[in-house]
Amino acid sequence: MVDVIKQRLDSLREVMKREKLAAFIFPSTDAHQSEYVAPHWQGREWISGFNGSAGIAVVTLTKAALWTDSRYFLAAEQQLKGTEYQLMKQRVEGTPTIAQWLGEQLAEVDSPEVGLDGMVNSYHEMQALVAELRQKGGITVRTNFDPLDIIWKDRPSIPDFPVEIQPLEYAGETLQSKLSRIRKALRVLHADGMLVSALDDIAWTLNLRGTDVHCVPVFVSYLLISSNKVSLFVDERKLTPQVTAYLAENGVSLYKYNKVEDELRTYSEYNILLDGDETSYRLWKAVKCQEIVSSASPIPVMKAVKNETEVKGFRRAMLRDGIAMVKFLRWLKPAVEMGGQTEMSVDRKLTSLRSEQPLFRDISFDTIAGYHEHGAIVHYEATTQTDAQLRPEGMILIDSGAQYQDGTTDITRTIALGPVSEKMKRIYTLVLKAHIQIELVKFPDGASGTQLDAVGRRCLWREGLNYLHGTGHGVGSYLSVHEGPHQIRMEWKPTPLRAGMTITDEPGIYLAGEFGVRIENTLLVTNYVQTDFGKFLQMEPLTLCPIDTAPIEMELMTPEEKMWLNDYHRMVFEKLSPWLEEDDKNWLKEATKPLK
């Protein structure tokens, strides 16, 4: 792979010289600012060899560097090894910004110009980068050129897989009702219309789903909503007669996907709302109407608060997922003891068991199954080169999830496969304590996830421990497993948590070269109590799966924490046992027996 990356960089630099570009920047996103992207837009991976979901590659005529966050530090070190790419660790002291690095690298170049594809870089990112580069020696930016169109000879085409209707029995709200709410929000923002670029927002609004992106049931498109018209820009080959008729019945006009830029140039309403974090730089610049209302899209918050039907769907999906997880966990340790199991084989087994459940559509992300030191790689993905043989000792971290038509699941369990060290027990127990504290918290309506983050981390900070990823993210309803805008994380995220939101609780500790521990449930924010001081909220676990008690250091657990775990395990057994065969039920009874 090292030689392949060198050849690709050589080809890129030949094109850069011809185009008089001093550098080119490759983000990890697509034309819709998606986290997970279709193969057509996986250019950053193609040019660098790094396959993480977050990262930016920057190539000059003589150097190459890749920026990524803490989830991928270890994976990036391994994947970039032997290439000329220098790893830049984001949010680590001493790491330069892209503009700072380019300013240093291009200091001796006369009138340097940097290239970016304006269709895959958001307006806000571009605006900030252009301003910073201008300060670093007058570097200019070109946005109308994509060298991958020239050098990536077998570049996959934009996907055109079929679209399907998400029935009202799972969606819980009609397309027309959603449009009415969106238009009402636009009036409050003094906007006549809006462009929707985010694929999950489009799928949610229209009650449609697709398979254009691995593990995320969305379809490549744009949606333009005005006061009296709705326009969907999509490859019509995706649309079955049923979907076409459904859209026509709901007054949705169809246009070719690649005509969105032309339509924006002739947009006749007085103004339009554009979300600078979701709208590409090129589309923003195409708008010619009198005023652009620069504002966050109102759709993500609407989508984040699940309606009653969606909540019921989540509960059903979690029940089926819990059944699959119990079958898997009962199988796991005996299978490892018999020998022959690897990280990849247990991944296949878990996916197979999930696929037996009704309404299963896909996994919700590529399973992370990290044994021993691989567990310390936050977003590890086993390959044939790294696939570790499992032994009846130590711990394996398994982060996995599924897409069911009535709900999306995301769960992490760290499991002792046999004897574990005292160090492992201590770290495991501290992570469990952090997990429990988030589930125990009660908080006033209007609090953000940032204000709750320290509640979970506190017991880790006392021990001088920390993790650099977020504590929790929203989860879509048969949509993206990572959903915003609400999060639980250290960095300031002002979106308040509201009853009806789903969010994960996933603290972890990762010791490079040794092991990692993460424990994750998906939670539902619910009403707790109304007092003279206002409304208070709480967290309800939706995930139904036992937490391994074998590695717990009991002396570290408080009575309140033991009570929470016992209550959780009681609920898991009560809800799952009626649906289990006798052997699975007996195993679950043992796995959920109360702590003393």
What kind of region is each of these model predictions?
Residues M1-K596:
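Active-site neighborhoods and metal-handling regions in enzymes and metal-associated proteins
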